[in-house]
Regions:
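Membrane-embedded catalytic interface detector for glycan/lipid assembly enzymes
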Residues: 27-32, 112-284, 478-485
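Membrane-interface helix-loop-helix junctions at transmembrane boundaries of multi-pass membrane enzymes
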Residues: 55-58, 197-210, 417-428
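Hydrophobic alpha-helical segments
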Residues: 375, 380-485
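Short aromatic-rich membrane-water interface segments that cap or initiate transmembrane helices
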Residues: 90-99, 170-186, 390-394
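N-terminal "leader" segments that precede or initiate the main folded domain
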Residues: 1-126, 215, 234-279, 447-485
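Hydrophobic, aromatic-rich transmembrane alpha-helices
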Residues: 43-48, 189-202, 403-417
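Hydrophobic alpha-helical transmembrane segments
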Residues: 97-107, 177-193, 307-315, 451-453
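Small-residue-enriched transmembrane helix-hairpin modules in multi-pass membrane proteins
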Residues: 170-173, 273-408
Length: 485
């Protein structure tokens, strides 16, 4: 008898969900926040297990669940297993926070289930010579834009690093203002846009790796500044791109070498990040063992649980306005007070860093709540961050959080499906969103797709596709049909 491991794994996943449901029922009867915490942890474990049943389409869900645990659940979990209790906040604060995360995870799962089972029976035809030629032209133009704008990307990061060398991290965060001409900023934004379009044309592994490597190397400067998130997100972005390409080109993109780099590099990176937690503040790690440093790193990432807790405690103190929306704030501000708003007479904010203006006049949740909680420390460069969960809950309540999470789950599946098709623009948009998506549990909801409404993005997209069209028309009879560069 041959054991069907796929079926066994499915039964393990089902059993995990059954345990989660029983724990949830137990919580209804005993009303214990410890039972609720264990229910939440089991729900995350079950959700992660479910992702591996169809990992080809659930890789985005998987990484998102992991970041939810890391940013929003790890701290109270570690507190409980180390101390046997959780008592930093009142019970109702923990209850709200755990339930909010549970509601979002259930919504994400339902969203994935609604769309992942629907297979697109319409098969894409083979690429015609014209299609291959056009994609090759897009590839060349987008690569040229990337290479032209990359030096400006580095220059702006180096300017930040030079400023940071002479001040503390928090002074840098509160006071830094670029002295470079504005056009350098505009050109630097094209790096990510052009990179995503270039990668969406599905170049070969060598050329893709070079471009991704340049992107990661650039973000090493962010790491030296003390800002870890861009560097970590660039690594996650590179991994998920390799994963998606490997699904249609099995064994080419992720082989023994790549797996070894991941299994060895991931723990080392976490230890380095843990060390940087202290180095950024000018402190040492003392006599911490490797395991203690590893656990400390995870614990410190869980500070975003405090956003849920403080959001619940201080929600009534948030600025009251005639119209207020945190969930879509970046888009609304771009239209009313950003580059687009300025064209129609809007007045931009005078400060881009922590300030009373952003704390009281903007609809940026992280700034509003940080000022309420920290006061003068916020103005000195400190902050508690934000979370898409608190933005949605503050604007729309638990029902809104649930419904928007369903839409997110649907969106995750749509994005991953775009990776397995030949639509360059759609895949490019997916890559742009993925570049910042996994920071959402400790950032804003709109941040990952905000660029899609900017003039810079659609301007450079138009330039790339228009130039590619001209090139295609000029050389369509002589170009190599393979379209490689």
């Amino acid at each position: 008898m041959i054991l069907d491991w796929k079926r066994v794994y499915y039964l393990i996943t089902l059993f995990s969900y059954v345990i989660t449901i029983f724990l949830g029922i137990a919580y209804i009867y005993n009303n214990s926040i410890i039972t609720l915490l264990i229910t939440l942890v089991m729900l995350i474990i079950s959700s992660i297990l479910y992702c591996f049943n169809n990992i080809k389409y659930y890789i985005i869900h998987l990484i998102f669940y992991i970041t939810i645990f890391l940013f929003l659940v790890s701290r109270p979990t570690i507190d409980y297993f180390k101390q046997g209790l959780i008592n930093t906040y009142q019970e109702d604060v923990y209850r709200f926070s755990f339930l909010a995360v549970i509601v979002s995870i259930i919504g994400l799962t339902i969203g994935g289930l609604l769309i992942s089972k629907k297979e697109n029976n319409k098969k894409e035809g083979y690429k015609t010579q014209k299609s291959r030629l056009f994609i090759n032209s897009i590839r060349k133009v987008s690569l040229a834009v990337f290479l032209i704008s990359y030096p400006f990307y580095l220059i702006r990061l180096i300017e930040r690093l030079m400023y940071r060398v002479n001040v503390s991290y928090y002074e840098y965060y509160a006071d830094f203002k670029s002295e470079l001409p504005y056009f350098t900023y505009t050109l630097s934004t094209f790096v990510v846009y052009a990179m995503c379009i270039y990668l969406a044309t599905k170049p070969n592994k060598r050329h893709s790796t070079i471009v991704l490597g340049m992107f990661v190397v650039g973000n090493v400067i962010n790491l030296l500044i003390g800002t870890r998130n861009p560097f970590v997100l660039s690594l996650i972005f590179s991994f998920i791109y390799y994963f998606m390409r490997n699904q249609t080109e099995k064994g080419i993109w992720i082989g023994v070498k790549e797996k070894a780099m991941f299994y060895i590099g991931a723990p080392i990176m976490m230890l380095v990040m843990g060390f940087l937690n202290y180095a950024r503040d000018g402190a040492g790690i003392g006599n911490m063992s490797i395991s203690e440093l590893f656990l400390d790193f995870i614990y410190k990432q869980g500070t975003s649980f405090g956003v849920l807790a403080r959001g619940y405690l201080y929600g009534s103190n948030l600025p009251i306005k005639e119209f207020r929306n945190y969930t879509f704030s970046p888009i609304i501000e771009y239209i009313t007070r950003g580059n687009l708003g300025i064209l129609f007479g809007g007045t931009p904010f005078t400060s881009a860093n922590n300030s009373l203006e952003l704390a009281l006049e903007s609809d940026r949740y992280a700034h509003n709540i940080s000022y309420i909680v920290l006061k003068q420390d916020y103005l000195a460069g400190h902050g508690i961050g934000g979370s898409y969960i608190m933005e949605m809950y503050t604007d729309y309540g638990m029902l809104g959080l649930f419904l928007l999470s369903i839409l997110m789950g649907i969106g995750f599946i749509f994005m991953i499906k775009s990776a397995y098709k030949s639509r360059v623009l759609l895949f490019g948009i997916t890559l742009l969103i993925l570049n910042n998506l996994f920071f959402m549990p400790r950032g804003g909801f709109t941040e990952s797709f905000f660029n899609l409404v900017t003039l810079q993005y659609w301007g450079i997209v138009f330039v790339i596709f228009f130039a590619a069209t001209l090139i295609e028309r000029k050389v369509k009879y002589t170009v190599n049909n393979k379209g490689d560069i």
